[in-house]
Amino acid sequence: MKHFEANFDGLVGPTHNYAGLSFGNVASFSNAAQTSNPKAAAKQGLQKAKSLADLGMVQGVLAPQERPDLYTLRRIGFSGSDAEVLQKAAQQAPALLNACCSASSMWTANAATVSPSADTRDGKVHFTPANLVDKLHRSIEPVTTGNILQATFNNDRYFKHHQHLPEHASFGDEGAANHTRLCSEYGHAGVELFVYGQTATNPDAPKPTKYPARQTLEASQAVARLHQLEDESCVFMQQNPNVIDQGVFHNDVISVGNKNVLFYHEQAFLDTETKFDEIRRKMNSDMYFVKVTTEQVSIDDAVRSYLFNTQIITLPSGEMAIIAPTNCQENPAVFAYLNELVTLGTPIKQVRYYDVKQSMQNGGGPACLRLRVAMNEQEVAAVNQNTLMDDGLFTRLNTWVDRHYRDQLTVSDLADPQLIIESRTALDELTQILKLGSVYLFQR
């Protein structure tokens, strides 16, 4: 049976804006209050997804969240008609309105953690939505994320869906952005690398001092238990607190893995060699640890270019390719390094560049935009086929974006009641295109 690593990219929602909501994310903060282009953002994301499908990859899409989130605004005390709720929130608590209008669900690396059937005791693919408790604008996502995942991976024979972890800082969980699966082949049992920023139950353990550590060891361990993973298939590794304080808010900003390759910056982790030895022992097959030194690429250049927020994919030919943002081409040190990397004798033989600048300006590169799901042929066939990218879906979704999305949006536009109507009309139509059923509260 054939095995694949599918990528499910988040569709950019109609309210894509630059409100600077993500403390600890340098790009998000530095581009706050700029005018965004939701239509361009959505089309950039679709083009990247279609390009991977054209390379022969299994590529899907995940629907965005309903925004503005009027249910949360009502829950925190704003009342009246929908228009009045928006107006009151804009006047009395604009920061809360901004949080309830974020299109951050486009970054599906934070949607959930996924364990493939080859690793789990019950032989099913397991999904746990991330609770994202560290950021208000993302903490309101998990319930709808779970609905969308269940409508996308909608066969109980093959897929097991869990509730997100308890909504408390001790279980801060940011999903697949802090999780990489290493294996010899996608269909073979692998090693799941869980990376955390702090141990919540040990106040004396190392942790960052400037920016928050969004992932706890306790959360990573809980997900491993839920997913029925054996101890021999898990490694828990701490991210270096110093790089979190330099703007590396998720591990996928400082390392990325695929199959038997882990591409990482030398400052990425604590206790690096001991943990790499554990990975080698548990993998029991050849591993390529591709280290980038500070001399080659500084942390600042890595964060600004998103060198590590790239995707590493295995092409049908068997070669590995890096899917990088065009920002990597524009950074001389990073571009020089990537040109050298393909000559170093690792499995990485190609680099392909894509323009995802609308996402990058909010702090999300190619790796943020996708959720990886390793599956066999039967599991791929059990996925909701309407969510898988092909020429027809690409055309339908581009037409849908043209019909419903604005080409500019400012933070002040978020108080426009028309945005509610536009967004709900768009999402209602999208659920019909993708055959998701009623995943949104306004449809129930």
Curated annotation (Swiss-Prot):
EC number: 3.5.3.23
Catalytic activity: N(2)-succinyl-L-arginine + 2 H2O + 2 H(+) = N(2)-succinyl-L-ornithine + 2 NH4(+) + CO2
Keyword annotations: Arginine metabolism, Hydrolase
Entry binding sites for substrate: 19-28, 110, 137-138, 214, 252, 362
GO biological process: arginine catabolic process to glutamate; arginine catabolic process to succinate
Pathway(s) per entry: Amino-acid degradation; L-arginine degradation via AST pathway; L-glutamate and succinate from L-arginine: step 2/5
Gene Ontology terms, MF aspect: N-succinylarginine dihydrolase activity
Active site location: 174, 250, 368 (nucleophile)
Subunit structure, interactors included: Homodimer.
Family annotation (PANTHER family): N-SUCCINYLARGININE DIHYDROLASE (PTHR30420:SF2)
Family statement drawn from the similarity comment of this UniProt entry: Belongs to the succinylarginine dihydrolase family.
Role of this protein: Catalyzes the hydrolysis of N(2)-succinylarginine into N(2)-succinylornithine, ammonia and CO(2).
Name used for this protein in its record: N-succinylarginine dihydrolase
Classification lineage: Bacteria, Pseudomonadati, Pseudomonadota, Gammaproteobacteria, Alteromonadales
